[in-house]
């Protein structure tokens, strides 16, 4: 970084933003408190840019990437910093907004910070919609649990089939009658909550279909759907959460981004590895582990998988087939060694991530 560059670090919150300005040759930044609206921050930065070159940074947080995009639109360099990778002093027990902004400016000039990838507007919109679906799915699960627990407390058990939440189960729920008005109202409220969540989920699923035609997702989804256990929804989630796979130099770097690499505490002659780090993208890790369960079965090209692979690039199809053979063999070897199924599937998901990266970067 040039010695003549002015560093501006922001500690951004909903109402106020602290700006730490570190001028060339100075060791202590000047601190300014601003309102968090973009026009105010832009005017502040433009005033400093008239004097010399500036570079900005701030921690990734709930305020998102709007400030970065507003600065980039005016040709002002701005990095969004990964909070988990900011160096911390073990004995530092004082934390304030002004202190955080000042430390961020000093560390940024020393090039001791790690910037994160900024998704495009389309990638962020797709990611938000997919995460919205996850939230609705969790709401539906909670609503169903509340209804099931209410019925169980009052001795109401569905025994017509072994599966719940089918049409027959819905008819059985509607046929329930209660001796007291309060119980009747409770039952209706719980059923209505389930129906509303189902309706919201179906509406979002319709919106997700439109994403399959919006660039740059279709090309990525086409390659991802060549793999066993990955259909439209899973492929969309991976494509949106991962972004452009070419930004990762190696397959292990993608595995680390998903939090699927093992933790390690080694020193000298001692080598100790522990559970996976879980420090990466939890949404991506979840769908990868779900897809990895499919590789406990023998390698096979079923009709649905053949349909998904139709028209896909031949290199992606070839990588997907090699993944099937390799990952099933890996599953069986680990199972023969007596490993727990959850550990096996996690290991398979880690290797599956490498195959997906290879298919996306061909």
Place the predicted regions along the sequence by residue.
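A detector of single, family-specific signature residues
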Residues: 1-362
């Amino acid at each position: 970084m040039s010695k003549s560059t002015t560093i501006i670090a922001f500690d951004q919150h909903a109402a106020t933003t602290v700006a730490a300005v570190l001028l060339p040759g100075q060791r202590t930044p000047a601190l300014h408190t601003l309102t968090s609206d973009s026009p105010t921050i832009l005017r502040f930065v433009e005033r400093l840019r008239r004097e010399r070159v500036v570079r900005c940074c701030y921690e990734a947080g709930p305020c998102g990437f709007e400030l970065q995009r507003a600065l980039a639109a005016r040709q002002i360099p701005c990095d969004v910093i990964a909070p988990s990778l900011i160096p911390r002093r073990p004995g530092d027990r004082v934390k304030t907004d002004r202190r955080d902004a000042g430390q961020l400016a000093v560390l940024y000039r020393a090039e001791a910070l790690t910037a994160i990838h900024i998704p495009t507007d389309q990638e962020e919109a797709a990611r938000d919609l997919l995460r919205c679906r996850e939230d609705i799915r969790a709401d539906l699960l909670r609503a169903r649990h509340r209804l099931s627990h209410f019925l169980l407390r009052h001795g109401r058990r569905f025994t017509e089939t072994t599966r719940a939440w089918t049409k027959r189960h819905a008819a059985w729920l509607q046929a329930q009658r209660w001796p007291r008005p309060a119980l009747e109202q409770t039952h209706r409220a719980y059923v209505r909550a389930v129906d509303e969540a189902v309706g919201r989920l179906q509406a979002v699923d319709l919106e997700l279909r439109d994403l399959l035609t919006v660039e740059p997702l279709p090309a990525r989804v086409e390659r991802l759907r060549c793999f066993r256990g990955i259909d439209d929804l899973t492929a969309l989630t991976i494509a949106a959460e991962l972004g452009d796979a070419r930004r990762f130099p190696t397959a292990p770097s993608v595995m680390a981004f998903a939090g699927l690499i093992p933790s390690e505490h080694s020193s000298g002659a001692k080598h100790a590895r522990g559970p996976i780090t879980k420090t990466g993208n939890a949404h991506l890790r979840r769908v990868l582990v779900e897809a990895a369960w499919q590789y406990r079965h023998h390698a096979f090209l079923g009709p649905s998988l053949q349909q998904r692979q139709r028209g896909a690039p031949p290199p992606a199809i070839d990588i997907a087939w090699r993944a099937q053979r390799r990952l099933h063999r890996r599953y069986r070897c680990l199972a023969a060694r007596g490993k727990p199924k959850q550990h096996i599937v996690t290991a398979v998901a880690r290797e599956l991530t490498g195959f997906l990266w290879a298919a996306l970067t061909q």
